[in-house]
Amino acid sequence: TLKEYNWQMKTCAQITTAETYHVPVMLHEAVDGMDIQPGGIYADLTLGGGGHTREILSRMNQNAHLYGFDQDEDAEQNIPSDERFTFVRSNFRYLSNFMRYYGADGKVDAILADLGVSSHHFDDSERGFSFRFDGKLDMRMNKRAGRTAAELVNTLSEEKLADIFYLYGELKNS
């Protein structure tokens, strides 16, 4: 069921627009590749600062719909106020589950995913993604999910940490 994914869905009417925290690189080129059509169904899998979402919405007609996913609660401040948009606070790995839920399973016309860590995450000392600031060693995209990086570093064995660095950090000499 959808409850097991710890998600929240809100429409734009329930959330106000806030200033963005990230400017997308190659914004127009990325959205051009989506070939926005009248009545289409689209997904922005990484809402973040909302830059791609706003550009997609600007190209859509009134019959189209856009679903925006983000597991980071900070992204909620960037949700555009538009009835053609539905925000889903969840990891995009559950895309197919949500599209089935909304009746759009197999009907998404284009998907955009701006993968990676945004400048917002590096600029927030509480997130623990940057060497520039003193702060907690958190490093989670979803602040409610799993253990922090500090908990992992302080509880896992040296062997297990070496495996993690090898598999996910591409440190072949770990």
Cite the ranges covered by each PLM segment.
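S-adenosyl-L-methionine-dependent methyltransferase catalytic core, i.e., the SAM/SAH-binding region
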Residues: 1-174
